Amino acid sequence: IRDDPKSCGMRSDGIDLKSEEKAPLETKSQTLYEVKRNPVFWIYSLSLSMHALFGTAIVFHIISIFEEVGKGKTEAFSYFIPAAIFSTTSNLLASWAADKIHLKPILSIMLVSFCLGSLGFINLQNNWGFWMLAFGFGVGGGLWGVLSNLSYIRFFGPNHLGEISGFSASLTVFASAIGPAAFSLGFDY
């Protein structure tokens, strides 16, 4: 049993054999202690966490959100189909592009799409608001999956990946846990 392709003398996926001489060197592995002092870690982790906070709040309260603007349960649940299509499409495209580009543009697009989804959320009474909500949170969710899987290995190396991604995941889980409660409090007051 081997831990990784490198230990068997094999190349990792995504390396073009024709451009082997141009292949980037493997990122130096950093410990969680070092990573916690790196602003790049916090930018990516907090961006992923913020998306989880809002996304979970919307999903948990989808019916009451739509009822607040005079729309019914059927319209509320119909949000999920276009959002899933946008999410799957953006995930496939970003997964393909991630081997060719830096992650910063993907993060930027995720944050812009999140803002568009938020704009759709506050204008949900309009038809365009519905589509902007589905597009924004759908695309953002698809890009969220790419970033949560690639950013830490790419920036901080493989040796402490479990520790680093686990800490980031705990921030995301915490954010997604408080999102629905915070939304309820905001709705009540």
Q: Model-flagged regions — what are they?
A:
Residues R2-S29:
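Flexible cytoplasmic inter-helical loops of multi-pass small-molecule transporters
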Residues Q30-W96, G179:
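Extracytoplasmic gate region of multi-pass secondary transporters
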Residues S49, G129-L143:
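Hydrophobic core of transmembrane alpha-helices in multi-pass small-molecule transporters
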Residues S49, I81-I85, V112, F135, ...:
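Transmembrane alpha-helical cores of Major Facilitator Superfamily
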Residues S90-H102, F187-D188:
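Helix-to-loop junctions at the C-terminal end of transmembrane segments
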Residues P105-G120:
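Structural signature of the two symmetry-related core transmembrane helices
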Residues L143-F156:
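Intracellular juxtamembrane helix-capping segments at the cytosolic ends
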Residues F156-Y189:
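A late C-terminal transmembrane helix in Major Facilitator Superfamily
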